[in-house]
Amino acid sequence: MLLAALGCTAAYSQAIGDHNYLGQELNTITTAVPFLQVAPDSRSGAMGDMGVATSADVNSQHHNPSKYVFNKNIFGVSISYSPWLRKLVNDINLLYLSAYWKITDYDALSFSLRYFSLGDIQFTDMYGQPMGTQKPNEFAIDLGYSRKLIDQLSIAITPRFIYSNLTAGQIVDNEPTNAGLAGAADVSMFYEQDFALGKSNMNSTLRAGFNISNIGNKISYSSGTLHRDFLPTNLKLGVSYAIDFNEHHTLMAGVEINKLLVPTPPEYLVNDSTGRIEYDAANNPIIKYGKNPDVSVAQGIFQSFNDAPGGAAEEFREVNWSVGLEYSYRNLLFVRAGYFFEHPTKGNRQFITVGAGIHYSIFGLDMAYLFTVDQHHPLENTLRFTLTFDFASFKKDDIRNQGKVQMN
């Protein structure tokens, strides 16, 4: 049976064309539930998906929940919508709801709900006969707690529940399938320091952050199989710098790198005469280069830094990077741009992003637009929209120093 749903979820994380790129073999890392990797909000989406070290906002939950305690307001909520992969089909959608509440000036709680609908999928059997139409979907719910350690540094922990229903209970190889369930967590840190710039006394802010996301159990879609897939455990590192030229004009620039912390597929030994993979006495495929990917989650995280069959050169190709700019006028009007790069042998996502936003009082509306370097890429012309409500509190001054740990 052709599980079209599985193909759709992989499509936005891969763009596989020829078998090699400039003599380098394609070796894309695949995981379950790749929808967790998609930047859902318009602000980040307009800056090359960069967000781990930008200023705090309502949508920090996806990028770096540690930022929430640096929000100037007390409570905020936002909803984001993106029609996804419109170059392929017209009914795949991503919805994202996020919110935060600053308990004190040193503590914050946060929440997000991410829902990914794959639209109508026509299932067929191994002979191509229709087996009905279903609407596969996935969602993730998470709660976060962030805490300032000192005035400039914060940390956060974010547990997550993941539900992935791709097969809608269809029978595959005479075996019933079920929805995949998983639990995961993010661990993050954020640094923010204000200072005067030179003799001009212009205000500026340096920010840095990291986030290790989706640390959790492997996921399976059948109770009768031993095969389980890794979650997209990912490491993000970033830094940004903002300058307030005066009370009206601010410019922020940043750079971010990220890497999947899951095993890289090895290169197996192939028989030259038959073209088939060779197996050992225990009926395991013989690895020619690289390492065995069938390991625990913890081992997979550490192994991911030195298991690529192409050695150090391939490890560096597994690092994606993005750059972004944001200009704001009186924190009212925003213009943004960015660029994201993923090596052609590792998925080939390369795109330019632009966007704009308007924020007035408690309301904010942002949008982002994506241009891909490859005009035939399924991500081409992707749009994102975000509506934000960010509230100051009448009791803001009352909580300003609550929660602070007194140091002797």
Task: Report each predicted region and the residues it spans.
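Sec-dependent N-terminal signal peptides
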Residues: M1-G7
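Sec/Tat signal peptide C-region and signal peptidase I cleavage site
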Residues: C8-S13
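Subset of outer-membrane beta-barrel
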Residues: Q14-N408
